[in-house]
């Protein structure tokens, strides 16, 4: 395999910045949807996805009062609701799940978990749980949650538990076609075991090359495996076998198998330096491997080409965006709460970015262009769907 010169994409790289462009403007009154002439665009703003609808959710700061949770559709406000205990709505971005234009939220209080749909009560659980993931499949809501006062995890279908474990560490809930999938691992007597769950049916994973199994994933119906046989990482599936030399001077933290277009997969091997307080990813793609700086946190968007990586730099004041097309972007003084604040469509990456210092407006970023939303607050989620 090709071993490219190692490089670290850290804060020392030069910045690619662009000015704030003309704003989208929204009503701050009680109306649920502003007039169309209150929304303006210009030639410097990113193009909206063709024949698609762009939804975004966010939190509006209100001086002296609770924040407002708001949902936008193509820049037009759909509804607002106060973030209060009484409404069971939190301003925390981790509790917002924007799926197919519907805003689901989670809220924990007094030993219970409340799930809302567009601000209205939907489900109630008798335990406090952290909602890690949600999927909406043919109007059926799937969720992955971790009890706050118990071990293990639970998968629910429309609020009812359909799969649960009292031990085990789950990764993300994801779709493979219409199949709901999950990987989780257990540790017993210092031995790690990996399981794949497909539509609530679990299967223990056996490494095909008798090496140490690090990861597994279902992609387009096939199981991909990531193994380690010192000094090589092995990424494989049916009729595919790729071997990558490990990076010396680093310790293994974790791994992810990244789904790509054309039924392919790559691997991200998360590493900690033995000589400096920094982390990095060894990326293994096709017959190439290289090292990529990880900053404070990184998120991958790989299902469409070009594949993209979004990295919050180590000092947490810059966002670095790069991809397989060779383009690089820096955005300063912004924060990016979680992976649900990004979406790929038509070969472009759309990100919800908010001002770290609270000054200026949050905006949708796309390929270096910005579409500001004219309110003081933050954007907490995005999704792109076919029009209703």
Task: Indicate residue ranges for each PLM-predicted region.
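Repeated scaffold domains used in trafficking and secretory/extracellular systems
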Residues: 88-100, 128-138, 167-177, 210-220, ...
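Surface-exposed loop/turn elements that mediate protein-protein interactions on large endomembrane-trafficking
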Residues: 70-81, 112-123, 152-163, 193-205, ...
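Short beta-strand elements that form the blades of beta-propeller/WD-repeat-like
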Residues: 51-63, 102-108, 140-148, 179-188, ...
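Beta-strand-rich domains and repeat architectures in extracellular enzymes and scaffolds
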Residues: 48-68, 86-94
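Hydrophobic strand positions within the blades of repeat-based beta-sheet folds
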Residues: 56-57, 69-70, 96, 105-106, ...
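Sec-dependent bacterial lipoprotein signal peptides
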Residues: 1-14
């Amino acid at each position: 395999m090709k071993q490219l010169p190692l490089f670290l994409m850290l804060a020392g790289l030069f910045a690619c910045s662009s000015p704030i462009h003309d704003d989208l403007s929204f009503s701050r009154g009680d109306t649920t949807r502003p007039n169309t002439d209150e929304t303006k665009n210009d030639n410097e703003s990113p193009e909206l996805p063709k024949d698609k609808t762009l939804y975004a959710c966010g939190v509006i700061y209100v001086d002296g009062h609770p924040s407002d949770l708001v949902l936008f559709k193509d820049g037009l406000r759909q509804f607002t609701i106060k973030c209060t205990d009484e409404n069971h709505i939190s301003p925390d971005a981790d509790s917002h799940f924007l799926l197919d234009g519907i805003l689901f939220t989670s809220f924990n209080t007094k030993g219970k978990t409340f799930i809302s749909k567009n601000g209205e009560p939907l489900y109630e659980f008798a335990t406090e749980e952290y909602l890690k993931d949600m999927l909406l499949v043919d109007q059926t809501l799937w969720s992955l949650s971790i009890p706050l006062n118990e071990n293990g995890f639970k998968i629910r279908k429309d609020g009812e538990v359909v799969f649960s474990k009292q031990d085990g560490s789950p990764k993300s809930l994801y779709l493979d076609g219409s199949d709901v999938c999950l990987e989780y691992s257990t540790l017993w007597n210092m031995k790690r075991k990996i399981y794949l769950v497909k539509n609530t049916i679990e299967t223990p994973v056996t490494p095909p090359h008798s090496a140490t199994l690090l990861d597994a994933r279902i992609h387009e119906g096939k199981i991909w495996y990531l193994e380690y046989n010192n000094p090589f990482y092995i990424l494989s599936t049916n009729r595919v076998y790729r071997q990558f030399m490990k990076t010396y001077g680093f310790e293994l933290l974790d791994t992810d198998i990244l789904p790509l277009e054309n039924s392919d997969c790559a691997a991200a091997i998360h590493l900690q330096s033995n000589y400096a307080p920094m982390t990095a990813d060894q990326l293994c793609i096709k017959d190439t491997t290289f090292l990529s700086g990880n900053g404070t946190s990184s998120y991958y968007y790989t299902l469409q080409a070009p594949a993209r990586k979004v990295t919050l730099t180590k000092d947490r004041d810059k966002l670095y965006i790069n991809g397989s097309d060779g383009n690089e972007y820096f955005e300063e003084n912004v924060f990016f709460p979680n992976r649900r604040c990004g979406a790929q469509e038509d070969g472009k990456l759309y990100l919800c970015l908010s001002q770290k210092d609270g000054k200026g407006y949050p905006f949708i970023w796309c390929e270096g262009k910005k579409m500001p939303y004219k309110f003081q607050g933050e954007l907490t989620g995005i999704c792109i769907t076919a029009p209703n």
